[in-house]
């Protein structure tokens, strides 16, 4: 949806909300679409009158994206325009307003509204707060691209070394993605204020400043079931299976890493389990046959996962002579795992991941 379309829709939504308030009526409306406010650095100016005949002007700035960076830009402009004039009230409007953007607006005395009619306004005794309307315009396009396979390689690097400052070139090399892909990831991270830039020109570096927010957003957009699963059965107990698998794969120099219950048992011993999970960078059936595991459709106790992207193996760690995924990957996998996985993920977060922040 382009800006003129958003302006038209926001104008209609605000008009409907105000007219149904029983307290305000609209006197006059001007918008950038009609060129009448083109010099005023706003998109819509709406004059309203209270039932006590007092008039105010609502200055509405529209952005096509509602991430915190754009909210701050709009808020800064609206504060400048409404400074020392109590007859003016600024409103930030966009397709969807994130929770952080809402907080930014409220903290600065600025209203907000989205295309579903969720809104917040407070001026001269008038208060309106509408939440919970289903927003069909809530796009996951930006987040989808931020949490896509190639992009998440950069996120793993940042989260595994959260205190380091990076040049785009260095992060791209470490994450094994192109310079262009890394630049796009950086731009999106800036939009959501997950990172902070320092320096000037070519010396400009950036570092993670909201690791928990980024990790939580990623976990909401990730499910371990995105990987390909191969289930097998062995008569051995899980501990013996894990030792046998680890010894064999190391002898063959095949990359692997335990995760889920098997990974948690070595980093966050929180779960009792009867099933082995591991990522494998080889043919699962070939390895299983060599180990004497039987392929099954139900009742398996060994699950070999082929990773959706090789970035899964970034930051793998050796514990008790066994390779497991990074704490970040283990947290992501556990978060939506049904057998008390979320509890194990939080245990891992509190006892291992946070200590690096």
Positions of PLM-derived features:
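Short gly/ser-rich loop at a beta-strand->alpha-helix junction or flexible surface loop bordering the NTP-binding
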Residues: 225-308
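Acidic-basic catalytic patches of nuclease active cores, encompassing PD-(D/E)XK
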Residues: 1-33
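Short alpha-helical segments that sit at the start of domains
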Residues: 128-153
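Charged, structured surface patches that assemble and position nucleic-acid processing machinery
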Residues: 109-121
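Loop-centered beta-sheet repeat module
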Residues: 154-217
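Conserved catalytic cores of phosphodiester-cleaving nucleases, focusing on short active-site segments
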Residues: 38-83, 91, 331
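Nucleic-acid nuclease catalytic cores
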Residues: 83-109
């Amino acid at each position: 949806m382009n800006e003129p379309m958003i302006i038209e829709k926001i104008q209609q939504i605000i008009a409907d909300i105000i007219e149904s308030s029983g307290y305000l009526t609209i006197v006059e409306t001007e918008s950038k679409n009609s060129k009448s406010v083109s010099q005023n650095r706003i998109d819509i100016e709406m004059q309203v009158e209270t039932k006590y005949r007092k008039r105010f002007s609502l200055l509405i700035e529209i952005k096509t994206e509602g991430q915190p960076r754009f909210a701050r830009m709009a808020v800064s402009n609206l504060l400048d325009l409404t400074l020392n004039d109590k007859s003016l009230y600024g409103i930030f409007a966009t397709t969807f307003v994130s929770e952080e953007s809402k907080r930014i607006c409220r903290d600065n005395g600025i209203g907000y509204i989205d295309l579903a009619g969720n809104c917040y306004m407070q001026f001269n005794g008038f208060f309106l707060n509408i939440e919970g309307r289903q927003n069909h315009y809530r796009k996951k396009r930006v987040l989808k691209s931020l949490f896509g396979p190639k992009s998440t390689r950069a996120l793993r690097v940042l989260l595994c070394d959260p205190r380091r400052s990076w040049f785009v070139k260095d992060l791209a090399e470490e994450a094994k993605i192109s310079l262009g892909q890394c630049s796009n990831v950086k731009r999106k991270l800036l939009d959501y204020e997950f990172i902070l830039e320092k320096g000037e020109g070519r010396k400009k570096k950036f570092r993670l400043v909201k690791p928990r927010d980024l990790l939580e957003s990623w976990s909401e957009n990730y499910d371990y079931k995105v990987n390909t699963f191969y289930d097998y059965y062995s008569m051995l107990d899980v501990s013996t299976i894990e030792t046998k698998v680890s010894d064999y794969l190391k002898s063959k120099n095949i990359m692997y890493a335990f995760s889920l219950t098997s990974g948690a048992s070595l980093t966050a011993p929180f779960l009792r389990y009867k099933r082995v999970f591991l990522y494998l960078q080889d043919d699962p059936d070939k390895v299983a046959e060599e180990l004497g595991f039987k392929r099954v459709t139900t009742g398996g106790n060994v699950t070999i996962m082929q990773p959706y992207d090789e970035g899964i193996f970034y930051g793998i760690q050796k514990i008790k002579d066994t390779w497991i995924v990074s704490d970040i990957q283990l947290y992501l996998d556990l978060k939506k795992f049904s057998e008390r996985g979320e509890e194990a993920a939080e245990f891992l977060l509190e006892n291992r991941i946070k200590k690096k922040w």
